[in-house]
Amino acid sequence: MSSAPNGRKKRPSRSTRSSIFQISKPPLQSGDWERRGSGSESAHKTQRALDDCKMLVQEFNTQVALYRELVISIGDVSVSCPSLRAEMHKTRTKGCEMARQAHQKLAAISGPEDGEIHPEICRLYIQLQCCLEMYTTEMLKSICLLGSLQFHRKGKEASGGAKNLDSKIEENAETPALEDSLSSPLESQQQCWQVATDIENTERDMREMKNLLSKLRETMPLPLKNQDDSSLLNLTPYPMVRRRKRRFFGLCCLVSS
């Protein structure tokens, strides 16, 4: 290496230094790309699961509203009781299945109980809880109505007595749908047995939905457990703060036209 006139050694040029001390970034390994891809894929899966859960809760809300309309129709003289009870059983069974699926999906995407939670998940928890509470209430109403009409029928059969045709026609016109005119005592006994079976099935489904409601409350995230009823539906992003209650915060169990 040549020396400068003043005795100092000549430093390498800038280009030489850059070539000597050049530091290149190592290429991304396959694992880095996989981690980046898996992060976006995980977020996409979470959003898709959230959308599926939201749709399930909305469908369950509709089923509860339909079941409520059927319960109101019990005893209506314009409705055939056997067909009404069959439709109630179909709607109730479908609603119970939707409630179970919604609870499973919601529990899967909620994450740790004491961790950060998306406000949309909080709303789904509250909506599902409200629907389940209304669902069990309507089941109890149907049990009471069917039981009272069944008791009314048995009381009239026990009283007995011959009736003329005119009085029977007048009675049938004022009788609730559960008391359809029967041609024989055997059919009457079969009808009573079917109603009793429907009541037992409804009681079983009601117990199952109450247990599901208890599980939902147990697995509910801590931010929701710490909120009072007045602020449950006025949720803000985590951490939650209390807000003024809005006038219209949403409706539960309405059939959309």
Swiss-Prot record:
| Mode of membrane association | Lipid-anchor
On assembly, the entry states:
Interacts with 'R7' family proteins RGS6, RGS7, RGS9 and RGS11. Component of some R7-Gbeta5 complex composed of some R7 protein (RGS6, RGS7, RGS9 or RGS11), Gbeta5 (GNB5) and RGS7BP.
Q: According to its UniProt record, where is this protein located? A: Nucleus; Cytoplasm; Cell membrane
Note the InterPro entries from the entry.
Answer: RGS7BP/RGS9BP
Output the PTM entry: Palmitoylated. Undergoes rapid palmitoylation turnover. De novo and turnover palmitoylation are both mediated by ZDHHC2. Palmitoylation regulates the cell membrane and nuclear shuttling and the regulation of GPCR signaling. Upon depalmitoylation, it is targeted from the plasma membrane into the nucleus. GPCR signaling inhibits depalmitoylation and promotes localization to the plasma membrane.
- State which tissues express it: Specifically expressed in the central nervous system including the retina but not in other non-neuronal tissues (at protein level).
In which family does this protein belong, per the annotation? Belongs to the RGS7BP/RGS9BP family.
An example GO CC term for this entry is:
presynapse
Query: According to the UniProt record, what happens if one changes residue 243 to E?
Result: Abolishes nuclear localization
Query: What keywords tag this UniProt record?
Result: Cell membrane, Cytoplasm, Lipoprotein, Membrane, Nucleus, Palmitate, Signal transduction inhibitor
Job description of the protein: Regulator of G protein-coupled receptor (GPCR) signaling. Regulatory subunit of the R7-Gbeta5 complexes that acts by controlling the subcellular location of the R7-Gbeta5 complexes. When palmitoylated, it targets the R7-Gbeta5 complexes to the plasma membrane, leading to inhibit G protein alpha subunits. When it is unpalmitoylated, the R7-Gbeta5 complexes undergo a nuclear/cytoplasmic shuttling. May also act by controlling the proteolytic stability of R7 proteins, probably by protecting them from degradation.
- Outline the segment boundaries, as ranges, of region: Disordered: 1-45
Q: Give me the residues lipidated as S-palmitoyl cysteine.
A: 252-253
- The record places the motif (Nuclear localization signal) at 242-247
Question: Domain notes, please?
Answer: The nuclear localization signal is both required for nuclear localization and palmitoylation.
Under which name does UniProt file this protein? Regulator of G-protein signaling 7-binding protein
| Composition bias type Basic and acidic residues, residue spans | 32-45
Its GO biological process annotations read:
G protein-coupled receptor signaling pathway; negative regulation of signal transduction; regulation of postsynaptic membrane potential
Highest rank taxon of the organism: Eukaryota
